From Swiss-Prot:
<feature type="active site" description="Proton acceptor">
    <location>
        <position position="97"/>
    </location>
</feature>
<feature type="binding site">
    <location>
        <begin position="40"/>
        <end position="45"/>
    </location>
    <ligand>
        <name>3'-phosphoadenylyl sulfate</name>
    </ligand>
</feature>
<dbReference type="GO" id="GO:0008146">
    <property type="term" value="F:sulfotransferase activity"/>
</dbReference>
<dbReference type="Pfam" id="PF00685">
    <property type="entry name" value="Sulfotransfer_1"/>
</dbReference>
<comment type="function">
    <text>Involved in the synthesis of cell wall sulfolipids with activity towards mycobacterial trehalose glycolipids and eukaryotic glycolipids such as glucosylceramide and galactosylceramide (type I and II) but not towards eukaryotic 3'-sulfate galactosylceramide.</text>
</comment>
<protein>
    <recommendedName>
        <fullName>Glycolipid sulfotransferase Rv1373</fullName>
        <ecNumber>2.8.2.-</ecNumber>
    </recommendedName>
</protein>
<keyword id="KW-0808">Transferase</keyword>
<comment type="similarity">
    <text>Belongs to the sulfotransferase 1 family.</text>
</comment>
<dbReference type="GO" id="GO:0005737">
    <property type="term" value="C:cytoplasm"/>
</dbReference>
<dbReference type="InterPro" id="IPR027417">
    <property type="entry name" value="P-loop_NTPase"/>
</dbReference>
<dbReference type="InterPro" id="IPR000863">
    <property type="entry name" value="Sulfotransferase_dom"/>
</dbReference>
<dbReference type="GO" id="GO:0046506">
    <property type="term" value="P:sulfolipid biosynthetic process"/>
</dbReference>
<dbReference type="GO" id="GO:0051923">
    <property type="term" value="P:sulfation"/>
</dbReference>
<feature type="binding site">
    <location>
        <begin position="116"/>
        <end position="124"/>
    </location>
    <ligand>
        <name>3'-phosphoadenylyl sulfate</name>
    </ligand>
</feature>
Length: 326
């Protein structure tokens, strides 16, 4: 659930999987990089791009999810995660699904924020849920989080199998903030459409800050080498176009899938039925098979209730739709 934290102006984001107050245990460093995105919006892809720049090549000192942990995730003791980060001598880059209004913005830190067409993110999460070992997730969560601090299951038992179309309708209509105790809302654990656009909105209103930069899944698909140059510039890391082209070959979906045991998140935690299936296809437009004409119309009505036109254009098409530098 989301609520105002009494000690700061941050919003508190707590669910079965994450607690943004875990950030209080970490001392940030000058030059740290925080990568934030809604689920299934290109965060792992961005971590891989940043890793290629930080290490100037494809090799990693360990699994990506250990080198660049999801700090908020409640399946590892925070002391263990912080100790790993404190021991790192390289420039740190840390994963979060927390919106920027749930983080303390530090002028010494770069915030790399990523978007994707919300419909594609929802389809991807639908498939990811089928690949996730929910029992294992719950065991890990309960081993870390005391009983009195645990959040209720992500959604109630509905008594019947739900079709993808039913899931999408709930996802489309759901509120920004789930009721207390629910943890997540549909779709299958992903935030609602309102949640996603809220998160992107927290970036959009801060996009002109010098240490906040926006990236988009569609732009990666269009020109991966060119997009690799953008975080290089933002992070002050020297890279030529030729070097970016060389590095980008290690960040294609096929390349990441071939090294899924290193690149996919949480591979050391046993939460996936298949590490390779985390990198399912990486395409766009699969949502069309689940949307009737009525859903199409409702979707466009709904998004215009939730966000301004410039944000919506960027959220759905990347810089082709609207350049956030404007």
């Amino acid at each position: 659930m989301n609520s105002e934290h009494p000690m700061t102006d941050r919003v508190v984001y707590r669910s079965l999987m994450a607690d943004n107050l875990r950030w209080d245990a970490l001392q940030l460093r000058d030059g740290d990089i925080i990568i934030s995105a809604p689920s299934k919006s290109g965060l792992t892809w961005t971590q891989r791009l940043v890793s290629l720049l930080v290490f100037d090549g494809p090799d990693l000192p360990g699994p990506l999810s250990t080198v660049s942990p999801w700090l908020d995730q409640t399946i590892r003791p925070i002391e263990e995660v912080v100790a790993t980060l404190d021991a790192q001598q390289h420039r740190r880059f840390i994963k979060t699904h927390t919106p920027l209004d749930g983080l303390v913005l530090d002028d010494r830190v770069s915030y790399i924020c990523v978007g994707r067409d919300p419909r594609d993110a929802a389809v991807s999460m639908l498939y990811q849920s089928a690949n996730m070992n929910e029992d294992r997730m719950r065991i890990l969560h309960e081993a870390v989080v005391p009983f009195h601090e645990r959040i209720a299951p992500p959604f109630a038992e509905l008594g019947h199998a739900r079709s993808p179309t039913e899931e999408f309708r709930d996802w489309m209509e759901g509120p920004n903030q789930p009721p207390p105790g629910i943890g997540f809302t549909h779709l299958k654990g992903i935030g609602t459409l309102a949640n996603i656009l809220h998160q992107l909105g927290t970036v959009w209103v801060r996009r002109h800050l010098p240490n906040v930069a926006l990236f988009h899944y569609a732009d990666y698909q269009a020109d991966l080498a060119g997009e690799l140059l953008r975080p290089a510039r933002v992070l002050g890391i020297a890279a030529t176009r030729d070097r970016a082209r060389d590095l980008a070959q290690y960040a294609t979906l096929d390349a990441m899938r071939s090294r899924a045991s290193e690149i996919a998140p949480n591979t050391t935690d046993g939460i996936w039925h298949s590490d390779e299936r985390f990198f399912r296809r990486g395409g766009s437009g699969d949502w069309q098979q689940f949307f009737t004409e009525a859903e199409h119309l409702r979707y466009y009505h709904r998004i215009n209730q939730l966000a301004p036109p410039d944000l919506l254009a960027w959220a759905h098409e990347g810089r082709r739709g609207y350049d956030p530098a404007n």
